[in-house]
From Swiss-Prot:
Its main location: secreted. Glycans are attached at N107, N205, N513. This is Retinol-binding protein 3. Residues 1-17 form the signal peptide. Residues 18-1228 are annotated as: 4 X approximate tandem repeats. The lineage of its organism: Eukaryota, Metazoa, Chordata, Craniata, Vertebrata. It comes from Mus musculus. Belongs to the peptidase S41A family. Gene3D superfamilies: 2-enoyl-CoA Hydratase, Chain A, domain 1, 3.30.750.44. Residues 383-417 are annotated as: Disordered.
Length: 1234
């Protein structure tokens, strides 16, 4: 910034010296001081002062002789440097004093104020009950407070009853910003206050927030009424801020010109003692409604509707007229939808959407049309439902052409026979094309009554010449349609050989609320053409109404193939409902009243009909003849495909179903839509895959000649030894990874004879490097398969020579035999064996033979498969030509069956043991190798931890011994999580102890390791609150105390807060006559505080032996005795105590309950406790993320050797936990009452 100022000021200070020096350089310093003290964008002035001082050191003197020129130069420099056109420097030699701002209105008398207000504020009520308020200068807060009642009674009340308001600010260029909240508040609802602006004043360096007023004199203008603000290029300052705020609030529509982009407060200040003055904006709007960005200052307020200022009022009144009509338009639209719209199920959604739409931005009929259509289309998805603008005479209420009416007047049928024959000849063009192909063109659909009258003539002149043709082309390219009443009659002529009437289509008419099924006519003049011969309809973009209905139905019924252009998409079955009438025009709704539903249950929404073969209209006839030639062979192609399936597909029962489906669809005309071999292949493939659920079934078109798969290929040329070495190195990638981990990648499966031929070289160059590794990774991620004949040989290397292993079985369709595939007794080179780990990497691109190898090894539990699921390939694929055509069918000819289950697996593909993205498969395999190498030491460590620490030494030693013998069970473990589950399950089976647990806790979850992370001790203040919430006390009826806590704490910790416990807990219950201790929800915790708690319920002397605890890690027995010294009073041994238990009472809570019951100090009431254990210890297993939680201590205080661990504490009074408290109160009350 400083560099920019140096350049600017150097420009200002340096010009060629003139004869007269107007001022000293201090003028620039004075100007800079005014900017620094008054300019409302001080952040833009950073570095200016230093730049001026630097420029002054150059001793360059500004020497312009003309002061006006100097003022212009200074203005241009300041405006360009600050990018602010509001900064202006003027030369005014006649001004002796600094110019004052406009006279302050508060210095005027009341009469003068009223006169001033009446000049600046004018109002009236315009035609249509539109309020008009013109403000040319906005008074400030003091004046509005002084004259508020006058303005309300003489101005505002006259406007309150209007239906809308025009606020005219076109001539307002001044005012005080303190008046802004008054204007905004009268137009803002009074239920909330709103922050509308923040004004920064530079001279005082203060920021003032502008909020709407919570209360105003008089009434506020209703929020339901429209407000329009008029602006012009002269609208400035405070008026701009008002227009901007109302626009951002969406409370007003701004109409007119962009405002001048001035400032809230401009001041003209003298520069030093010179005759130069600087006009500078001293205040600025921070505009919270604009999101904190740049507001209107400098750029102006852009109107919602731009128009010249002198036309703004007229435009505003037109907008208000439209907006007054909006509720009526929406209401009529909703009524029209309810009364006429044929898709009744969509009406509620449309009504709701219309009611919830925001119309605040609608300022023209075009806006309204766009908004309504967007809403209607979004909900209905019906292109026929449309709002449109109408001309002055185009908005009368009338339905469009109905379903039984013609868009043009139907010509009268002549009575003379010659005239009728001539009429038929003029409407129909009939000819027979080469190849015995009938051609029929007619350019208009007639009413059913007309056809009935002209029937004999049409039959004789049109229909009979076409009866013996093999195919029929009907030309509708020039047919704009007509009435559709004759549709069932016309369609009936194309019905098949069925005896009874056939349902053609269904219609629903909203006006009559009738759903009607339309059937073919039983009796017809003349013969039917039927649907066994090919019928081809030619269409164009001019084909409309009844003509496109006919095309749609013929295509839907499968009776015709359409060729040409997409039709017009204009239907007859709509109604026009006027929504708005005005002298200039109006709005109308086009609403569909009738819906066509074809035999598939699909409703036609009136879009253009899409032909099966899309070509230009002028090319349609030629293309139809090409399609016709193709269809002559259609039956043979479909039948041929079905026969190939039955003969070669690997799943015979599916092949029969597939062929039956093809025959059925052919008979129904489903393949008439196929217009070439490509589209037929696509349809056949979709049908075959749908019925078989086999993605490997394909029909495709190949113009070139394919080599039949049954023909043996010529033997490949035998490569030289050098070439063979090069090929092997290129095709096979090997490596020995750290840890003696072999890696083998090959991306193709060769044929068995080829593998045998190059066997010695493969063994020498590839296999010998890998056979002695500790484990092997076979990477098939990039192997699409190919020949499967070498799979048994590959598998054999990973099993022993004897006994031979059944790998899988193959069902061959050609022989209809199942062949079992076994490992080979002899292989070249050394076997890898059956004991070393094998890992196979797969991806979604791995196919056929690669899948066979992976699935076989996985099925026999010989390998761990890692990667992505495969798609499911085929061991053998046959490609067969359909007849002599360039159409081919590709299908699996063999089916792979699992050796273990006998089920076919090849279609489903291979599901990995561990599913990861293919990019992570190798690293995952390496991690598993490392993990499996750790398993023996992990089991050894786990056994030692159990033997050394389990609370029962004998059982711990037995578990350790048995665990080492289970190592083979872990041979296929794939993750530490799985290892933790298996180890935990084995330990619990061996011990019968559910508290002996194993967990896998990753590095990022160490806070969940029990017993590892110490609990943070809170401050005494926090602890005081914690105690109050953790302990629940009460004194019940008959002075029975109640104490509940749900966890035991550490003794050392509780000692630190013992005084808090006594003060806030114990003192409340110590003087009761009996006590209930609620342990029903206590989950245990440290046992170190149990002796202290028990001591409160015994006398000071003599000491009582509470229990003996055996600790396995140090192989010692510790005794728990009552304490002789306690904080606070003892409860003593005489008063009754009851302890409540439940099935969740555990750990330390059970130890406490057990001691109190065994010593006869408490009556236990409730349910048998959970049978937990003394607090266990958690141990980390080697360098893994495995942790073993081991019960290390047990109670041995009972003379009979009994304990509560694992079996729980049996209450003296067994009741459900929900009734325990009630039962305890009853027993204690009975004891107290004696």
């Amino acid at each position: 910034m400083m560099r920019e100022w140096v350049l600017v000021l150097s420009t200002l200070l340096w010009v060629p010296a003139g004869p007269t020096h107007l001022f000293q350089p201090s003028l620039v310093l004075d100007m800079a001081k005014i900017l620094l003290d008054n300019y409302c964008f001080p952040e833009n002035l950073m570095g200016m002062q230093a730049a001026i001082e630097q420029a002054m050191k150059s001793h360059e003197i500004l020497g312009i002789s003309d002061p006006q020129t100097l003022a212009q130069v200074l203005t241009a420099g300041v405006q360009s440097s600050l990018s602010d056109p509001r900064l202006f420097i003027s030369y005014e030699p006649s001004t002796l004093e600094a110019p004052q701002q406009a006279p302050v209105l508060t210095n005027l008398t009341r009469e003068e104020l009223l006169a001033q207000i009446q000049r600046n504020i004018r109002h009236e009520v315009l035609e249509g009950n539109v309020g008009y308020l013109r403000v040319d200068d906005l008074p400030g807060q003091e004046v509005l407070s002084e004259l508020g009642e006058f303005l309300v009674s003489h101005v505002w009340r006259q406007l309150m009853g209007t239906s809308s308001l025009v606020l005219d600010l076109r001539h307002c260029s001044g005012g005080h910003f303190s008046g802004i909240p008054y204007v905004i508040s009268y137009l803002h609802p009074g239920n909330t206050v709103m922050h509308v602006d923040t004004v920064y004043d530079r001279p005082s360096n203060t920021t003032t927030e502008i909020w709407t007023l919570p209360e105003v004199l008089g009434e506020r203008y209703s929020a339901d009424k429209d407000v329009v603000v008029l602006t012009s290029g002269h609208t400035g300052g405070v008026a701009e801020d008002i227009a901007y705020i109302l626009k951002q609030m969406r409370r007003a529509i701004v109409v007119g010109e962009r405002t001048e982009g001035g400032a809230l407060d401009l001041q003209k200040l003298r520069i030093g003692q010179s005759n130069f003055f600087l006009t500078v904006p001293v205040s600025r709007s921070l505009g919270p409604l604009g999101g904190g960005g740049q507001t209107w200052e400098g750029s102006g307020v852009l109107p919602c509707v731009g128009t010249p200022a002198e036309q703004a009022l007229e435009k505003a009144l037109a907008i208000l007229t439209l907006r007054r009509a909006l509720p009526g338009v929406v209401l009529r639209l909703q009524e029209a939808l309810q009364d006429y719209y044929t898709l009744v199920d969509r009406v509620p959604g449309l009504l709701h959407h219309l009611a919830s739409m925001d119309y605040s931005a609608v300022v023209s009929e075009e806006d309204l049309v766009t908004k309504l259509n967007a809403g209607l289309q979004a909900v209905s998805e019906d292109p026929r439902l449309l709002v449109r603008a109408t001309g002055p005479r185009d908005s009368s209420s009338r339905p469009e052409t109905g379903p039984n009416e013609s868009p043009a007047a139907t010509p009268e049928v002549p009575t003379e026979e010659d005239a009728r024959r001539a009429l038929v000849d003029s409407v129909f063009q009939v000819s027979v094309l080469p190849g015995n192909v009938g051609y029929l063109r007619f350019d208009r659909f007639a009413d059913a009554a007309v056809l009935e009258t002209l029937g004999p003539y049409v039959l004789k002149q049109v229909w009979e010449p076409l009866q013996d043709t093999e195919h029929l082309i009907m030309d509708l390219r020039h047919n704009p349609g007509g009435p559709s009443s004759a549709m069932p009659l016309v369609l009936s002529y194309f019905q098949g050989p069925e005896a009874g009437p056939v349902r053609l289509f269904t219609t629903y008419d909203r006006r009559t609320n009738i759903t009607q099924e339309h059937f073919s006519h039983r009796e017809l003049l003349g013969q039917r053409y039927g649907n066994q011969r090919g019928v081809y309809l030619l269409t164009s973009h001019r084909t409309a109404t009844a003509a496109e209905e006919f095309a749609f139905l013929m295509q839907s019924l499968g009776w015709a193939t359409l060729v040409g252009e997409i039709t017009a998409g204009s239907l007859l079955h709509t109604c026009t409902v006027p929504l708005l009438d005005s002298p200039q025009g109006g709005l109308a709704l086009t609403v569909p009243v009738l819906t066509f539903i074809d035999n598939h249950g699909e409703a036609w929404l009136g879009g253009g009909v899409v032909p099966d073969a899309i070509v230009l209209a002028e090319e349609a006839l030629e293309r139809a003849q090409e399609v016709l030639d193709f269809h002559r062979s259609l039956g043979a192609l479909v039948e041929g495909t079905g026969r190939l399936l039955e003969a070669h597909y690997a799943r015979p029962e599916i092949a029969q179903r597939a062929r039956a489906l093809l025959q059925s669809k052919l008979a129904q005309g489903a393949y008439r839509t196929a217009v070439d071999l490509e589209s037929l292949a696509s349809q056949l493939t979709a049908d075959l895959q749908e019925v078989s659920e086999d993605h490997r079934l394909l029909v495709f078109h190949s113009p070139g000649e394919l080599v039949a798969e049954e023909v043996p290929l010529p033997p490949p040329a035998v490569p030289s030894p050098e070439e063979l070495s090069y090929l092997i190195e290129a095709l096979f990638k090997t490596d020995v990874l750290p840890g003696q981990l072999g890696y083998l990648r090959f991306d193709a499966m060769a044929e068995l004879e080829t593998v045998k031929a190059i066997g010695p070289q493969l063994v020498q160059l590839v296999w010998q490097r890998l056979v002695d590794t500790a484990a092997l990774i076979v990477d098939l991620r990039y192997n699409p398969g190919s020949y499967s004949s070498a799979v048994p040989l590959l598998c054999s290397y990973f099993f022993e020579a004897e006994p031979r292993q059944h790998l899988y079985s193959v069902f061959d369709r050609a022989t209809s035999r199942v062949t079992e595939i076994w490992t080979l007794p002899l292989v070249a080179g050394q076997r890898y064996g059956s004991h070393k780990d094998l890992y196979i990497l797969m991806s979604h691109t791995s196919g056929s033979a690669a899948e066979a190898f992976a699935h076989t090894m996985q099925d026999l539990q010989r390998a761990t498969v890692i990667g992505e699921p495969t798609a499911g390939g085929a061991l053998s694929v046959g490609i067969y030509q359909v007849g002599n055509s360039p159409l081919y069918a590709s299908m699996p000819t063999q089916m792979a069956l699992s050796a273990s289950t006998g089920e076919a697996w090849d279609l489903a593909g291979v599901e990995p043991d561990i599913t990861v993205p293919m990019s992570e498969a190798l690293s995952t395999a390496q991690d598993i190798v490392v993990l499996r190498a750790k398993v023996p030491t992990v089991l050894q460590t786990a056994g030692k931890l159990v033997a050394d620490n389990y609370a029962s030494p004998e059982l711990g030693a037995k578990m350790a011994a048995k665990l080492s013998g289970l190592q083979s069970r872990y041979a296929r473990v794939t993750s530490e999580g799985a290892l933790a589950e298996m180890l935990g399950a084995d330990l619990q089976i061996l011990s019968g102890d559910p508290h002996l647990k194993t967990a896998h806790i990753p590095e990022d979850a160490k806070d969940r390791i029990p017993g590892i992370v110490p609990m943070q001790i809170p401050s005494p203040e926090v602890f005081e609150d914690l105690i109050k919430f953790s302990f629940h006390t009460n004194v019940l009826e008959d002075n029975i105390g109640y104490l509940r806590f749900d966890m035991f704490g550490d003794c050392e910790l509780l000692t630190q807060v013992s005084e808090l416990l006594v003060e806030h807990i114990w003192k409340k219950i110590v003087h009761t006559d009996a006590l209930i201790i609620d342990m029903r929800f206590n989950l245990g915790g440290p046992t170190s505080s149990i002796s202290a708690l028990c001591s409160y319920f015994f006398d000071e002397a003599p000491p009582i032996l509470l229990d003996k605890i055996y600790n396995r890690p140090n192989d010692s027995v510790s005794e728990l005795w009552t304490h002789t010294q306690l904080t606070g009073e003892r409860y003593g041994s005489k008063k009754s105590v009851a302890i409540l238990t439940s099935g969740v009472t555990a750990g330390a809570a059970e130890e406490f309950t057990y001691i109190m019951k065994r010593l006869g100090r408490a009556l236990v009431i409730g349910e048998v406790t959970s049978g937990g254990c003394q607090p266990p210890q958690t141990y980390h297993v080697d360098d893994t993320h495995l942790y073993i939680t081991i019960p290390t201590a047990r109670s041995v205080g009972a003379e009979d050797g009994s304990s509560w661990e694992g079996v729980g504490v049996t209450p003296n009074v067994v009741v459900s936990s929900e009734l325990a408290l009630t039962r305890a109160k009853e027993i204690l009350q009975q004891a107290l009452r004696g």
